[in-house]
Amino acid sequence: MAVVEMRKLTVIGLNSSRTPFIHELMHLGVVEIDSNEGVINDEEWMPDIFRTSNSADVSRLEADISRVSTALEAIGKYDTAKKPLFPSRIKLDRGDFAKLMDSIKTETELNVDKAVETYKDIADRRTEINRLRGLIAGLKPWETLDIPLEMNETEHALVQLGAAPVKTDTVQMTADVQAAAPSVIVQEVSKDKQQKYYAFICLKEEKEQLLEALRPYNFSAVTLADQKGTATEAMHRYEKEIEKNEKNIAEDEEILKKLVAYREHIEFLYDSLMMRRDRARVVGDMVSTEMVFYFDGWMPAKAQPEVEALLKEYEFYYNIEEPDPDDESVPVLLQNNSIVTPFEAVTGMYSLPGRHDIDPTAILAPFYFLFFGLMLSDAAYGLILTTLCAIILKKYKPEGTTHRMIKMFMFCGLSTFMWGALFGGWFGNFFTVAAKTFFGKEFVIRPLWFDPLSEPMRLLVVSLILGAIHLFVGMGVQAYMDIKDGRPLDALFDIGLWYLLLIGIVLFAFGGKLGAGAVGIGKIMAIVGAVGILLTGGRKKKGIFGKLTGGLGSLYGITSYLSDVLSYSRLLALGLATGVVAQVFNTLGSLAGGGIAGSILLIVVFAFGTVFNIAINALGAFVHSCRLQYVEFFGKFYTGGGRPFAPFERKTKYIKILKEGNDNVK
């Protein structure tokens, strides 16, 4: 359980050597470079230094990255190759990668341009097709109208098209408009579920009377004068244009399908651009004079030899020192063994420890392991979870946080198997149900300890005992931190007295089984603890009244401890839920009895129920195990707030550069 010791690094080097040096620094991947805001804003430095202006380079590279990303998206839609569940990065020697990029860069950039342009052409044509289909839909009601649409008026007459609700009485409407405008000719062209479509021909001087007469009928005028020919002719013309666009899209898609063969090279170009962009950003974080550049940074103490070797190779001035004890800007890096490291994901989701804090990962790991397994608590589910995670780790070799999470679930599967065997849970009671349904025999896998469904109160006691131990460990960590920081009295008064009180209460209440003496000892411990808390709980407050009220307030905190212990009853709830849900599915699967139909039903229901139960209850176990760490456990000693160490390194998506050879990628 270690927070890695950090060193502060200051470097001054020649501008002429900056580019190759930055390549090598990225290759090492162990130095975090500060933004150097303090230096650039220091009045003493300001006349002589400036920040390298490379925002244009960064913007250009980001535009190139976006373009390559679009190309990958375009050809990805036509890549029929089966994609792995967890894609792995291709491993390449840095020198080989540099040579490869030199040989494929020009061709790959042309392929990117072709993919992007083709993809855009497809998008534009699909937009045009949608527009044309919209026009066709608008013309559909008028396809029986044999009047050219552009001829909406003559010297003396006009054609008014429009629509009214489908419930409109055409005969009555015709009578009304002809009464207002005697010259009107009315034609009901078509109708659909919502509207009727009409064409009105009248003298120009009667247009206002026509529209006024149509107002009570919720008439909506339609203008199609921008169309050429009849509606049928225009629709046919648009359909031809759609066919032409669809043909061009098919040709474009064939181009993209051929470019799939170059996908790997385009991925290489993407990562190359990402590295160039990151190097350009780092240059922007440095400050310079006409001849030299300067930066501050952080590195793990264990990386000092290789960083010093690089700086000496370039003959740069540098200074490496321990950070100021009060400097809160120091980044945090955790280092644990292979068993504990997977559980760093749990710590990281809450907050990293401060630089002076204890890394809680090694302490929470065994409890998380136990709690997760107790909540899922089915031996068969545990074997499935562990086996599945082991296969993923071996076959797909995920990296980073994904690797840690899957490995953690693999360990938690072992815990699930252990608790399941202790409680007798093997796919719930599947084997018992199957034996009785198909063979008429009783078959029960006996628990190695006890059956929680038969003895739920016993499981509740186990849950609360584990919770109390969990809380006591958290309190012990706080006591250790107090002693380490030179506050032994705080450890005694704030933790030791609570140990006395809480343990005393437990002995007083339940110590009868240990003998009458245990009850008496518990009573004395509880009284001493309570009086001690009352007298010392307000020791940091001023005045007798303040100290007394502070002591009473501290003693009232016993209700908080009771609440915290009761929170661990969720171990009981989720532990029972897994078994109950499994038994429900097993019972449903056996309703058809024996025979072929019964066998099929049982297999289908069993398979679905198993997947459902593992998914739902594993998620619940994950969430609630985290909750017990974050709220109950961390609440006793942990504040967090550490800033994660973010080294300047290759952040690639498709390739993994090995730390060998020379890096000459431009």
Regions found by a protein language model. Give the residues of each.
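Long, charged N-terminal accessory/stalk domains
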Residues: M1-L364, I392, E399-T402, I406
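Conserved, carboxylate-rich catalytic/transport cores that coordinate ions
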Residues: A2-R7, T19-I22, M26-I33, P305-K666
